[in-house]
Structure formats: C-alpha cells, structure tokens
C-alpha cells in the first residue's frame, strides 16, 4: 500500500528552506507517491530498489552518471551551462548531485580526483529523492526525459567552478 505525499511547489532557482526536513520537488515532478516515483525512475534509469538504510529508492548508474559536489560548485557549474537542463538534487549536508549522461570513450574521468568531486561511476548505486524521505530533494530540472546533459560539458562546468 502506498501513501500519497503532498508535494510543495519549488521554483527553479528558489532558495531551499533552512530546514530540509521535508522533501521538496519542483512543480513539474510527475511523481507524488512512492509508487509513482518508483515507476517514473524505472522508466528513466532502469530497475530501482528500496534501500532500508537510506530509506530511499536507489538505481544503478548505467543510463547516467552523477557528480557529487558542494553547493557552491553546483551553483557555479549550473550557471556555466547557460540554461541547459541539468537535473540537480540536494543531500541534506550541503551536497549537490548533478545528473549527467554516461561518459564517452573520449572523456577523461580521472580529471576530478584532486578536485574533491565524487563520481557516481558505472554500476554504482545512487539513492534518489524519494517521497517521504526528507534527506534528498530535487532542486532543479526534475528529469522529465531520458536525455541528460553530456558528461564532458558538465565536467568542464564543474572544473571551471573549481578554478574560479
């Protein structure tokens, strides 16, 4: 049995309230319940599972990659992409997760290692924002389709933010 969760409105770019105890989703989020979220994520990224430790739906990074960065790096990187759709969600302790397409063979994934950026690599498990769990919430660009920004463009934006 699933319980519907009423989702508050969040305009893209709006400041997240100081207390992240409630999950925030943008108005475009089609999923308003646990079951809806699970179906939606599975359509985008493949099989999901509920992780009792994180109390979140998780998915393996096959159809995407993710970069975990500080709030400041995420803000600068997002601006550097000049309005390109970049799904970003927050994790309660000031961490931002930027969703990107998988790297191509030409992409250099080790460029991040000295920069303090954590890469959610191939087949790694990622906990996603989940209704009823206040520790992760979408900030911008709730993924509305399977198309994600190219890995190298997000890498360049984050590296530029690291240098700036």
Locate each region found by the language model.
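Signature for HUH/AEP ssDNA processing cores
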Residues: 1-93, 102-104, 138-164
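Helical (often loop-to-helix) elements that flank the catalytic cores of nucleotide-handling enzymes
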Residues: 99-123
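A recognition module on extended beta-rich or small alphabeta surfaces enriched in W/G with H and D/E
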Residues: 120-148
